[in-house]
Swiss-Prot record:
InterPro entries: NADH_UbQ_OxRdtase_chain4L/K, NUOK/Mnh_C1-like. This is NAD(P)H-quinone oxidoreductase subunit 4L, chloroplastic. NDH shuttles electrons from NAD(P)H:plastoquinone, via FMN and iron-sulfur (Fe-S) centers, to quinones in the photosynthetic chain and possibly in a chloroplast respiratory chain. The immediate electron acceptor for the enzyme in this species is believed to be plastoquinone. Couples the redox reaction to proton translocation, and thus conserves the redox energy in a proton gradient. It comes from Nandina domestica. GO terms for cellular component: chloroplast thylakoid membrane; NADH dehydrogenase complex. Keywords: Chloroplast, Membrane, NAD, NADP, Plastid, Plastoquinone, Quinone, Thylakoid, Translocase, Transmembrane, Transmembrane helix, Transport. The gene is ndhE. Belongs to the complex I subunit 4L family. PANTHER family: NADH-UBIQUINONE OXIDOREDUCTASE CHAIN 4L, NADH-UBIQUINONE OXIDOREDUCTASE SUBUNIT ND4L.
Amino acid sequence: MMLEHVLVLSAYLLSIGIYGLITSRNMVRALMCLELILNAVNMNFVTFSDLFDSRQIKGDIFSIFVIAIAAAEAAIGLAIVSSIYRNRKSTRINQSNLLNK
């Protein structure tokens, strides 16, 4: 696959993720958009690692670390959303004012 195609796809994923993160009112959807952003970053790491020096796998290893951190972030985020839903009966961002209790 050509470099430009991968970068355009990564830019689309990044822009969709940022747009969804800004406009989302649901916490689960916001977490999914954050995962899209992290996947776009991973695509860039792997692409540029292969472009500059295909013998070294620094970009691939860094992508594996980002995937592991994203998995932990998703697990913790979903646990927090589940706890908020149990207490507030809603996962909407604008309805869950956690500072007022």
